[in-house]
Amino acid sequence: MPALERRINKTGSAVSPKCNTTEPRQLCCTKVVQSSMGSLLRTKIEYRPLAEWLAGCGKPVYGALLDGESLWSGTVPPPTEEGAVLVIGNEGAGISPEVQQYITHRVKIPNLGGTAESLNAAVACAILTAELLRGKVCQSK
C-alpha cells in the first residue's frame, strides 16, 4: 500500500484504500504510515464504496483487466482535462463485477513475451499512470 500511495500522491490523485471499502484501518497501520514517508498525510482519501463513488464521478474510468486493450495499441484515449480514474484490483480477485460496470476503458499492460500473468499492484499502478499521463501530454503537444 505505501508504494502505491506514494505513486498516487505524485500524480495528484485520490486513493480509495483497499479498493472498495469503508474500512480505514488499512491506512492507519504504523508500518503503512511510516513507509509512506509522509506522503500519506498529503493524499486525499475517500472512505466510501468505490462503486458508489464511480457512479457519480463523471470522469473516464480506466480499469486494469487481463482482457483489456493494450496501452501501447495507440487507440486508448488519454485522460481528459477534468482527470480520470484508474481502478486496479488485487492479484487474486481482480476488479469486482460491481465496479467493472463503471469502467469506460478496459486496459492492460502488454506482455512482451514473458510468462507472468500479472504484476504487483504498485508496479502496475506506476506503469499505467505513467503511460496514461504520457498519452495525455503527447496529445496536448
PLM features per residue range, with description:
Residues 1-71:
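RNA substrate-binding interface of SAM-dependent RNA methyltransferases
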Residues 11-14, 24-41, 97-141:
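Structured adenosyl-cofactor binding patch, chiefly the S-adenosyl-L-methionine
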Residues 22, 47, 88, 114-117:
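Alpha-helix initiation/capping motif
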Residues 50, 54, 71, 78, ...:
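Flexible domain-boundary/linker segments
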Residues 58-61, 80, 123:
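Short, surface-exposed amphipathic charged segments that create phosphate/polyanion-binding patches used
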Residues 63-115:
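Active-site/ligand-binding-proximal alpha/beta "capping" segment
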